[in-house]
Amino acid sequence: MFEPYVKIKKKRSVNEIYENENLEQQQHHLQQQQQQPATSDNCCCENGEPQNAPEVATATVAATSVAATSAAATVATGAAASSSSSGNCSRLQQLISTPPVLLRRSSLQQQQHQQQQHHPHTPAATATPPQQQQQQQAAPSVLQQHLGHLNYESGATAAAAATAAAAAATVATSRSGSATLAQHLATPSNILQAAFGSSNLQHILTRSAPSPSSSAISSNNCSSACAGNTHYNGGNSNSGSSSSNSNHHSNSIIASRLFGAASSSSSSSSSSASASSSSVAASSSSSSHHLHSHHSALTNSITNRINQSIRRHLNQQQHHHPLSASSSSASASPSASTSSSSSYQQSSVQQQHYNCAHPAQQQQHHHHHHSSSSSSSSSSSSSHHHHNSSSSSNSNNQQQPQQSPLCLVLLVKCPNSKEFCNAAANFCDKRLPVNECQASQTARVTSNLHASSSTMAVSRVPSPPLPEVNTPVAENWCYTQVKVVKFSYMWTINNFSFCREEMGEVLKSSTFSAGANDKLKWCLRVNPKGLDEESKDYLSLYLLLVSCNKSEVRAKFKFSILNAKREETKAMESQRAYRFVQGKDWGFKKFIRRDFLLDEANGLLPEDKLTIFCEVSVVADSVNISGQSNIVQFKVPECKLSEDLGNLFDNEKFSDVTLSVGGREFQAHKAILAARSDVFAAMFEHEMEERKLNRVAITDVDHEVLKEMLRFIYTGKAPNLEKMADDLLAAADKYALEKLKVMCEEALCVNLSVETAAETLILADLHSADQLKAQTIDFINTHATDVMETSGWQNMITTHSHLIAEAFRALATQQIPPIGPPRKRVKMS
């Protein structure tokens, strides 16, 4: 989709074109020599005044060189319509082949003044129109070189096109066009002359619109351009109407509408001019209606918005420069009185000269006043003001040649645009950034007509970005963490196929818990042939809470069977956390079918061993963590105190005490030893030998055990605890290292077995390891038959008999509820 747009660019300085003055003078003498009458037998022009033939030829060349746009053709036809022109073809071709040269405006005014003095009564004193036509060609050509729109033709093509165009223009001759142009030139526009003081706008409009692919360089297009000019000026020729309509579609729509609207709103000061103007307005109105029928209503809206925007900016510029406009009018008043005192014929010639020299101002003047209706008296009174502005503009250009005015280029590519931005109306909806909003750029550019270079474009405004998702933020917050203790237990039943198969028979596992300090004791219960008649073909499996220190416990459980590959199979999990009380069990009455379990093909009983794997998740107390959002959270680095003190122990820096054991010495620090152990603190505080000598002799601990104990004192870790748990327990108890003592108890409890149960119980009793002692007694009571057969048990009977009594006392006080239904008595008959 093409979009209409308006561009404002700065014209090159006029001084850059005034470089070849010698060539200019030679051209002037050549033009005067060519004014002599000459005849030819093969003349292609109509009979008439020969002095006007160069006007037609030159105007036709101008229209041909720019691909015959409507704006330039209108000016050329208006100049040609002042009389029924005819001339010499040879002289016409010489004028066409002459290269265009831009003349100074001051030289042009002097030539006009001299011609009016030497030939006051002959209208043939128009040697300047060919020069003005050459100026009209040269000035846009230089600007087109700056803008990149060159469209020159060869001399032969231009001559042939000029000949055909002259014939078509002669047929379409009408004096009403001259009167209409005189009316348009009579409307005041100081700001237009100040801003557009050159004749470039007309040719910029004609050269910028045609497509490069069009065949505008042919003689047929030249004829259609002339016919199009006649169509806009109210002529009667219809020979090129069809080609003119197509040419208007490919050229500037805005330029053609400006001329059509301006022709319908202008008026004249005399009665004859008013009558001709009304006829031209009627013809132009019908032509404009025929042209507008090819465009959509949206194109009209875009055109009106652009016209209103340009008028508003020109009015603002006129208010900004009231003093300069008034001074220009005052300086040009003598020339205005001279022009007003001349005859009507001389006034018409001057208006034609001004039309050729200032087409851009005429077009911009039409565009500025196309929507206003003025009376005949106002148009007549403004005619002098317009010529005064022209004279003042020329004088200003001579005095200040460095200041180049701006040239307004109107380009409309496609009238079928469906969307347009409010930039044409100078309105910004704040949906774009400042550097992207075209409406904001328009306001900045058009507020100063002397800006260096800017662009005002009408483009599509994108939709606003989606707003960011706002997440709610609370000032206070709370995080509740429910603590869940998870542990597992594996139970292996050897020779499972030999188990008693009576219904309701129960097999019970040993008790287990989540840890050494956990008061919750659990066990598994299995019914090999079901619990009742309903489940006699199944294996029933239950989780039993043996003892607890709470009223109830909530827990979830999961049962599975390990196959020969030690993989979990036939897993069943509780759907929720059940409430357990002491002596209460939960499980599955129909856990697995017996025939499926006993089938060797399934691999669930490798070597006739049933391995049950149980996972328990006990719900403990919940913990609430609360805080406030306004507190700044900093990322605190992890504490490396343990590593730092470990390095201090290894490098032995700043040590002040020596610990010797078995011929080995360890360097240590009194402060650290005293802070970690009460025994060392008492040793260094009192008047003891260790304090005086700064040396501690240890005889009942191995050096490896002492080194591990010292490492724990410095770092809080014991990497080799598993290897020396029993000896390290004794050292921790001696030097009051409670944490190390509990760590040793845990390691010994994990490795508790039938063979080591008696020795572990003796060690726990000797070093007051209460937790290890309780766990060992429970283990002995569970495996009493096996433990009694060991040598350690036999030795404990003789050396530590009180431990045997404690073990049996714990067995007696342990309350285990009856498991399973009571056995029925068998009646003896």
Curated annotation (Swiss-Prot):
Residue intervals of the BTB domain: 655-722
GO cellular component entries: Cul3-RING ubiquitin ligase complex; cytoplasm; nucleoplasm; nucleus
Annotated compartments: Nucleus
PROSITE patterns listed in its UniProt record: BTB, MATH
Pfam families per UniProt: BACK_BPM_SPOP, BTB, MATH_2
Domain of life of the native organism: Eukaryota
Compositional bias per record (Low complexity), positions renumbered to this chain: 24-36, 122-140, 266-288, 323-353, 372-382, 389-400
Biased composition (Basic residues): 313-322
Residue ranges that the Swiss-Prot or TrEMBL entry lists as coiled coil: none
GO molecular function terms attached to this record: identical protein binding; protein homodimerization activity; ubiquitin protein ligase binding; ubiquitin-like ligase-substrate adaptor activity
InterPro entries for this protein: BACK_BPM_SPOP (IPR056423), BTB/POZ_dom (IPR000210), MATH/TRAF_dom (IPR002083), SKP1/BTB/POZ_sf (IPR011333), TRAF-like (IPR008974)
Main location (coarse class): nucleus
Presence of keyword Methyltransferase: no
Tissue-specificity statement: Expressed near the anterio-posterior compartment boundary of antenna, leg and wing disks.
Swiss-Prot/TrEMBL keywords: Developmental protein, Nucleus, Segmentation polarity protein, Ubl conjugation pathway
GO biological process, one term: segment polarity determination
Region annotated Disordered, chain positions: 24-47, 106-142, 266-296, 313-400
Annotated ranges, domain MATH: 486-616
Induction conditions: By hh during segmentation.
Domain-level remarks: The MATH domain interacts with ci.
Assembly with partners or alone: Interacts with ci and gft/CUL3.
Role according to the record: Involved in segment polarity. In complex with gft/CUL3, promotes ubiquitination of ci and its subsequent degradation by the proteasome, which results in hh signaling attenuation. This regulation may be important during eye formation for proper packing of ommatidia into a hexagonal array.
Protein name per Swiss-Prot or TrEMBL: Protein roadkill
Phylogenetic placement of the source organism: Eukaryota, Metazoa, Ecdysozoa, Arthropoda, Hexapoda
Record gene name: rdx
